[in-house]
Design a protein with these regions (language model features):
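Well-ordered, non-membrane alpha-helical segments in soluble/globular domains
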Residues: 13-20, 69-73, 104-115
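VWA/integrin I-like adhesion module and closely mimicked acidic/polar interface patches used
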Residues: 98-154
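Surface-exposed acidic, glycine-flexible loop patches that form ligand/cofactor-binding
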Residues: 26-30, 76-87, 117-120
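Von Willebrand factor
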Residues: 45-47, 51-88, 99, 131-139
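Short coil/turn segments at secondary-structure boundaries
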Residues: 3-8, 38, 49-56, 104-107, ...
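Conserved beta-strand elements of beta-rich interaction domains across eukaryotes
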Residues: 1, 42-45, 96-100, 131-135, ...
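…and closely analogous acidic/polar surface helices at protein-protein or active-site interfaces
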Residues: 1-34
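P/S/T/G-enriched low-complexity
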Residues: 134-204
Length: 204
């Protein structure tokens, strides 16, 4: 995803990498066991415990297809995602396109099946960090944000701020720090999750 943002010197993919690295770095502070980073087309980096290791993991540029269903299925079958584990799993999925299978064929129904029917929403919270303008992708991510329990979707900073101000008012304060907080806990805190959604009106 090479779409330019802001002053044109940055791309949405670079922004996504930056926010993902921030999320990982914060995660290493709050989880003494470290955080696990799974890539779709190369080996995982497990038990990352400091910012230097985060930087090393992102040296190689992304390549290949987007087999999200297979990757998610593998992760939610790990012991950390099982009911009864002493900690819940907060899963961040950073993506810039439509899910495919390992051969590159569109695979959205299978990914949706894993999210709805195989993921346990009580033990596995999912935070999507996306950078795409494809109408189909935007539509199904927005639907999942509204209908799936313990799931939140966050776009790049400028798009997210514009969406929030569309519903909350043009002067609604939303800084880069607020963006990082939403990216971190949107799938855990319903109030944060709802920031980029229409305000519900109670007719009572």
């Amino acid at each position: 995803m090479a779409t330019s943002v802001g002053d044109g010197k940055n791309t949405r993919w670079n922004e996504l990498c930056k926010i993902t690295k921030i999320v990982l770095e914060v995660g290493t502070i709050f989880d003494s066991n470290g955080v696990d980073l799974f890539f779709l087309n190369r080996p995982a980096s497990l038990r990352i415990k400091n910012a230097r290791d985060v930087d090393k993991a992102f040296v190689s540029a992304p390549s290949g297809y987007t087999p999200l269903a297979a990757a998610l299925r593998y992760i939610i079958r790990l012991p950390a995602a099982k009911r009864g584990n002493d900690k819940k799993l907060l899963l961040f999925i950073a993506t810039d396109g439509e899910p495919t299978d390992e051969e590159g064929n569109p695979d959205l129904p299978e990914f949706e099946n894993v999210m709805y029917n195989e993921r346990n929403p009580e033990t596995t919270h999912v935070m999507f960090l996306i950078c795409t303008d494809e109408p189909g992708c935007v539509e199904y991510f927005a639907k999942w944000d509204r209908t799936m329990k313990n799931v939140d979707v966050t776009d790049d900073f400028r798009t997210e701020r514009a969406t929030i101000r569309q519903y909350r008012g043009c002067d609604y304060p939303f800084s880069l720090g607020d963006y990082v907080i939403k990216a971190l806990i949107g799938a855990v805190d319903p109030t944060i999750d709802a920031l980029n959604e229409p305000i519900e009106v109670n007719d009572d």
